[in-house]
Structure formats: structure tokens, C-alpha cells
Design a protein with these regions (language model features):
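A general secondary-structure signal for short beta-strands and their flanking turns/coil
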Residues: 18-20, 50, 64-66, 100-102, ...
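Intrinsically disordered, low-complexity Pro/Gly/Ser/Thr-rich segments with frequent PxxP/GP/PP motifs
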Residues: 43-44, 49, 60, 86-113
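Membrane engagement elements in two modes
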Residues: 1-35, 142
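Mid-length scaffold segments of soluble, non-membrane domains
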Residues: 33-84
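Generic structural hydrophobic/aromatic packing signal, biased to beta-strands
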Residues: 21-25, 69, 90, 129
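Buried hydrophobic-core signal for structured, non-transmembrane domains
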Residues: 54-57, 105, 127-129
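Short, well-ordered turn and helix-capping elements at secondary-structure junctions
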Residues: 29, 38-40, 113
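Terminal connector regions
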Residues: 64-74, 78-81, 85-86, 111-142
Length: 142
């Protein structure tokens, strides 16, 4: 993730605010024979509440392939308040030929966002994921 890098958290916040933000999920695949989509395209979530989203993934190729998901949130100023408790994007994923899987991401929006003049009025955010072949991903890191 670029400027909109999200945070990794070990625990949920202690408070849930009676304010909602609409979170849109954008899914992409690069250099893999995979279909990848969110089961829910948009979620209206309360700030501070833990949410769970499922993604459907399918390998339509004829061999086992490995993917790594990169992620980014926009607007980028929101990234520090988008906290993941668990995500398929933390690890390399493998899918056999024809295999379908459900990947899960658990997240919350940090209540501190309402104290930041750059984020307190944000009502819509987009979480984007792109799966790359792990071979491609490793080469790009050299």
C-alpha cells in the first residue's frame, strides 16, 4: 500500500461510535488465472466496530498457483485509521487448479479518526486489493 497503507492491530477498540463510514471493496488480479471478488461490494460500518468481510477466489487455470495480495486504502489520509485484525493479505495464498476458496479480512475503523481534521468528515473509503503471482511479487522486490 502506498500513502494509504493500513494498520495491523492486535485488539479491537474499546468504544464504538454512532457514526458510520461506507467502505467499498475493490478487487483486482495481476498475472494470475484467478477470479477474485468481495462477497459484499460496500459495507456501512460503525466507527470502532469490528467487521468481517469475505472474498471469493477461484483458480481457473490448470495448475496450482500462488498469490500475494497488495492493498491500499483511499483517501490515503485514512490509512492510519483502517486497522486490520486479520487478513488473507498477510500471507502467500495457494490455489490448486479449479479450486475455489473464501478469504476473510477482519477490520475496524479507529475511533481516533474523528479527532483528525483530515479524516473526521470522511464518509466513504475504498479498500483496494490486487493479487499478484508470488513469482512476480518476489521479482519486483529485487
Amino acid at each position: 500500500g502506498f500513502g494509504g497503507t493500513t494498520q495491523i492491530s492486535k485488539e479491537a477498540p474499546l468504544i464504538v461510535l454512532d457514526q458510520k463510514v461506507s467502505v467499498r471493496f475493490d478487487t483486482n488480479v495481476n498475472t494470475l488465472p484467478w477470479n477474485f471478488k468481495a462477497k459484499t461490494n460496500v459495507m456501512d460500518v460503525k466507527i470502532g466496530q469490528v467487521n468481517r468481510i469475505e472474498f471469493e477466489v477461484e483458480n481457473y487455470g490448470n495448475e496450482t498457483t500462488y498469490g500475494v495480495a497488495t492493498f491500499n486504502v483511499s483517501p490515503s489520509s485514512f490509512g492510519k485509521y483502517y486497522s486490520k485484525l486479520g487478513c488473507f493479505c498477510f500471507e502467500k495464498q495457494a490455489l490448486k487448479a479449479g479450486e475455489k476458496a473464501t478469504y476473510i479480512m477482519t477490520f475496524y475503523l479507529d475511533p481516533e479518526m474523528v479527532n483528525d481534521p483530515n479524516t473526521k468528515n470522511i464518509k466513504d473509503v475504498t479498500m483496494s486489493y490486487t493479487f499478484f503471482s508470488s513469482d512476480y511479487y518476489n521479482q519486483s522486490k529485487l
